Design a protein with these regions (language model features):
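Acidic/histidine-rich alpha-helical segments that form the ligand environment
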Residues: 14, 72-123
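Short, charged low-complexity intrinsically disordered segments located at boundaries
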Residues: 43-51, 73-74, 79-83, 127-134
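Helix-loop segments that flank and shape redox-cofactor active sites
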Residues: 14-39, 60, 103-114
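Conserved alpha-helical segments that form or flank metal/cofactor-binding pockets of metalloenzymes
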Residues: 31-67
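A structural signal for well-ordered alpha-helices, especially hydrophobic packing surfaces
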Residues: 4, 8, 15-18, 22, ...
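Long, contiguous binding/interaction regions
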Residues: 25, 35, 62-75, 91-98, ...
Length: 138
């Protein structure tokens, strides 16, 4: 079973990668991708804080984000580079965004308020990842 602590770690990683993609976006559809990536990382960092606080209130510990990618238990490939094409960005966002959505969907054992926050995050993330990024270039 996933925990809020694990979910918050993956949300942070997604936000961090979205910020890197945002900084180095280039090429066609630059402005729309640049703005959507900013929306994505802002949503991720807002919910990272919410989920981390909820995890702590449930007796879970939250790792320092600087250590997250170094953890052996984390299944994540950080985004590296300094120039990203439209297709690369869309692929990264969809792959990693849907991974985080699936984690939230499979999170059990928390009371209704926590689940409602996870559902709200997943809905917002799904809107950005699968709808807005899915429409780029169409």
């Amino acid at each position: 079973m996933n925990t809020l602590s694990e979910l918050s770690s993956y949300v942070y990683l997604l936000g961090n990668d979205a910020r890197i993609l945002h900084l180095y976006t280039e090429g066609e559809n630059f402005m729309s991708i640049h703005e959507l990536l900013q929306d994505l990382y802002e949503v991720c960092f807002e919910y990272y804080d919410t989920f981390a606080e909820m995890a702590i209130s449930h007796g879970e510990s939250i790792p320092n984000p600087s250590d997250i990618v170094l953890s052996e238990g984390i299944d994540w490939n950080p985004t590296f580079g300094d120039a990203f094409s439209t297709n690369f960005i869309i692929g990264e966002v969809k792959e990693k965004g849907n991974k985080v959505i699936a984690m939230g969907d499979n999170l059990d054992g928390y009371e209704g308020f926590v689940k409602s926050e996870i559902d709200a995050f997943n809905a917002e993330l799904d809107s950005i990842v699968n709808y807005k990024f899915g429409r780029i270039g169409k």
